[in-house]
Amino acid sequence: MEKLYFDDTTYIWKTKLNLVEYKKLLLKEAIDVIESQPEVKSDGFGYKQEWKENLNFLGEIIINNKLDEVVKRGINCCKEIYKEKNIEYNKINTDAWVNLVRSNNPVQIQFKHDEMRGVDKYHTHTEINKKNKSFFPHYTYVYYIQMPDVMEGEDGVLYFRGENKKEYWIRPEEDDIIVMEGWMPHAPNNAPKSTIDRVVLAGNVGFEFIKKEKSLL
């Protein structure tokens, strides 16, 4: 993976998964996930959340469809990056979701009202998981299934906020997978003139070492 630096302490990793030929299938599977959860009024639609319940889960999954393949490869990207830390682990915690930024009537609050643009647009997955009493995510990956077809200025970009409070951005392309530290403040921008929505599959990955209790037998 390519490591892209915005400054000395602000960086992401990026590569291609070479799944462009499967875009229609990936999009169909993602839409199926969205349509299966009509009660969800936010922009995130949970996918295979049961993985985080498996104590012995080490990133090996049975691939039943293309979304599963993306999840598997997203986990592998995070494992590759974490390997550089040379820290032992025996459990991987993970979750995944389909994220939708609508070109028309987006549900994110910063797009609903002009006066809210730029206000509290950032989020971090360490904070989200803490509030949800879930695992600590070392990394978050995002795979871009579909990007807007009309983008002007900073439409469609992904914003990052560094430790120096400076704002940076990158405009992802379809088939990009981006990995960031779980604590990285980030925010997607919409593209109001686009005729199609931004659709991604994203996930958190956390590494843990669980001490095994010795049996008295």
Predicted regions: what they are:
Residues 1-90, 97, 119:
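Non-heme Fe(II)/2-oxoglutarate
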